[in-house]
């Protein structure tokens, strides 16, 4: 009698995603059969990313992992903006890169390199997969000039300050945000000579007598590309128009993405009409803000939470990833240290369960057995329902809690789900969660020495000394865990 291996699980639930452009859930129909092409607005590398910024990239990573889980060949592009992003997000203020370079007395190129590396370190810490391509804005300036030349005659006009896009030349401008195009609406400050309040610069001229650190020759004079032009060009160059999905934070829904769409309409058709077909991407997706009790997180106040601060306090970055997954991406997520602590506790429970499972199943089965098919189907249904991670996590924890099942099959099911959630539980060690808080005087060797002394005291039945040592250890910010193989953990504030 031959023994047949279980058939591979094939996710079959229809994938439905919320399209900000149409304001409804839509079935995902790839532009190219069997493929998914995704562009995500990346950081402007003038400062460290805060954890609210990083929520956008956890969301984009989750989307990409889900598309891969659904059997699609994923091409994911994330840009790095190293020029052209003004402090006002529209057409007022100065370039954020130039402002930081002046503040830190460094070149813009040094600023870009430093903060790009800092961003990539956070990407790695949060177990965000590398995209197929990082596109760096300054590497695409010739293509940006060519794009602007193609649309300039019918859709742009020139002022002393730059080349501006006339939003009245495309159909239904601002559909994404229902933005107003009239002057005085308060959405965008006026620039002298603009035809419409919402018109925006696609090329900013260097003022006479000035020299910027980043500037290029163009048909409209020496200058630099506008922020909105950059994303239109990089997404179209790498993915081609139309592509499947464009992601970004909800703040992009107001100005940046409507302007991208307007440019794409102008580029993709002769009359600027037909928003759904010519918006560049078929589906536009936006994650909501991370908020504190004082309001949404931003860098403008000069006070914001970096991922490194969480680590300095002893929290593993994947606890923050789990915190993000506990809320739907379109919902506001309130950050609190209590909430982060609860996510860390939940992550520890998961890791303990996976660790115990790995002891029973040294190898992962090639495929989960049929016992796990209903769970995988529920997990698939949750993720296919506009990335319902809260339900998916519940199903995942149900699987972790199953008893009297084949451990190798169970580990295969856990691995399949975690490949989507991205918590890295099969590779993570419990000791990795034990991060020493910054400023704590004692190190791990010192703790182990005290624990050895306490162990000796208990062996000698010197319970008074044992209790005194436990108190001494606790006073140093350490929790002793008798009976747990890990032995101890840091107490986190």
From Swiss-Prot:
Disulfide pairings: none
Catalytic activity: tRNA(Cys) + L-cysteine + ATP = L-cysteinyl-tRNA(Cys) + AMP + diphosphate
Compartment(s) where it occurs, according to its Swiss-Prot or TrEMBL record: Cytoplasm
GO biological process: cysteinyl-tRNA aminoacylation
Cofactor: Zn(2+)
InterPro entries: Cys-tRNA-ligase, Cys-tRNA-synt_Ia_DALR, Cys-tRNA/MSH_ligase, CysS_C, Rossmann-like_a/b/a_fold, tRNA-synt_1_cat_dom, tRNAsynth_Ia_anticodon-bd
Cofactor note: Binds 1 zinc ion per subunit.
Residues the entry annotates as binding Zn(2+): 41, 231, 256, 260
Motif window: 'HIGH' region: 43-53
SUPFAM superfamilies documented for this protein: Anticodon-binding domain of a subclass of class I aminoacyl-tRNA synthetases (SSF47323), Nucleotidylyl transferase (SSF52374)
Record keywords, A-Z: Aminoacyl-tRNA synthetase, ATP-binding, Cytoplasm, Ligase, Metal-binding, Nucleotide-binding, Protein biosynthesis, Zinc
Gene Ontology MF term list: ATP binding; cysteine-tRNA ligase activity; zinc ion binding
Chief location bin: cytoplasm
Enzyme class per UniProt: ligase
Annotated Gene Ontology cellular component terms: cytosol
Domain of life, per lineage: Bacteria
Motif ('KMSKS' region): 296-300
E.C. number(s) listed in UniProt: 6.1.1.16
Binding sites annotated in the UniProt record for ATP: 299
Known partners and oligomeric status: Monomer.
Family membership: Belongs to the class-I aminoacyl-tRNA synthetase family.
Entries under HAMAP family matching the protein: Cys_tRNA_synth (MF_00041)
PANTHER family: CYSTEINE--TRNA LIGASE, CYTOPLASMIC, CYSTEINYL-TRNA SYNTHETASE
Family annotation (NCBIfam families): cysS
Protein name (database record): Cysteine--tRNA ligase
């Amino acid at each position: 009698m031959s023994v047949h291996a279980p058939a591979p699980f094939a996710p079959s639930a229809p994938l439905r995603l919320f399209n900000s452009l149409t304001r409804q859930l839509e079935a995902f129909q790839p532009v190219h059969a069997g493929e998914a092409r995704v562009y995500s607005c990346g950081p402007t590398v003038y400062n460290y990313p805060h954890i609210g910024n990083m929520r956008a990239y956890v969301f984009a990573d989750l989307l990409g992992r889900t598309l891969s889980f659904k059997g699609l060949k994923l091409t994911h592009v994330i840009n790095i903006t190293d020029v052209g992003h003004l402090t006002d997000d529209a057409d007022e203020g100065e370039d954020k890169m130039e402002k930081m370079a002046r503040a830190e007395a460094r070149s813009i190129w040094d600023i870009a390199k430093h903060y790009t590396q800092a961003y990539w370190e956070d990407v790695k810490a949060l177990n965000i997969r590398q995209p197929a391509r990082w596109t760096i804005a300054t590497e695409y300036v010739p293509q940006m000039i060519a794009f602007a030349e193609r649309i300039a005659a019918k859709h742009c006009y020139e002022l002393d300050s730059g080349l501006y896009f006339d939003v009245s030349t495309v159909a239904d401008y601002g559909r994404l945000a229902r933005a107003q195009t009239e002057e005085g609406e308060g959405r965008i400050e006026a620039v002298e000579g603009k035809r419409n309040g919402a018109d925006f610069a696609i090329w900013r001229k260097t003022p006479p007598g000035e020299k910027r650190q980043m500037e290029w020759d163009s048909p409209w004079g020496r200058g630099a590309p506008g922020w909105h032009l950059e994303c239109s060009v990089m997404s179209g160059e790498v993915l081609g128009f139309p592509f499947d999905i464009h992601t970004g934070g909800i703040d992009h829904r107001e100005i940046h993405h409507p302007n991208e769409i307007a440019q794409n309409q102008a580029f993709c058709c002769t009359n600027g009409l037909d928003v759904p077909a010519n918006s560049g991407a078929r589906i536009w997706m936006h994650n909501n803000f991370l908020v504190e009790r004082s309001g949404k997180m931003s860098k403008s106040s000069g006070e914001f939470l970096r991922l490194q601060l969480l680590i300095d306090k002893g929290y593993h970055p994947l606890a923050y990833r789990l915190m993000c997954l506990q809320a739907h991406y379109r919902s506001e997520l309130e950050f609190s240290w209590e909430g982060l602590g609860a996510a860390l506790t939940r992550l520890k429970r998961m890791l303990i369960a996976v660790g115990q499972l790995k002891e029973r199943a040294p190898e992962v089965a090639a495929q989960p057995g049929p016992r796990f098919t209903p769970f995988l189907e529920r997990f698939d249904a949750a993720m296919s329902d506009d990335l319902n991670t809260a339900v998916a996590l519940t199903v995942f924890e149900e699987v972790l809690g199953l008893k009297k099942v084949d451990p190798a099959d169970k580990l295969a099911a856990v691995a399949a789900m975690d490949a989507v959630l991205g918590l890295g539980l099969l590779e993570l060690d419990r000791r990795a969660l034990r991060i020493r808080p910054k400023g704590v005087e004692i190190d791990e060797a010192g703790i182990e020495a005290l624990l050895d002394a306490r162990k000796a005291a208990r062996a000698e039945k010197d319970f008074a000394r044992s209790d005194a040592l436990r108190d001494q250890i606790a006073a140093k910010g350490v929790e002793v865990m008798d009976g747990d193989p890990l032995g101890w953990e840091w107490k986190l504030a």
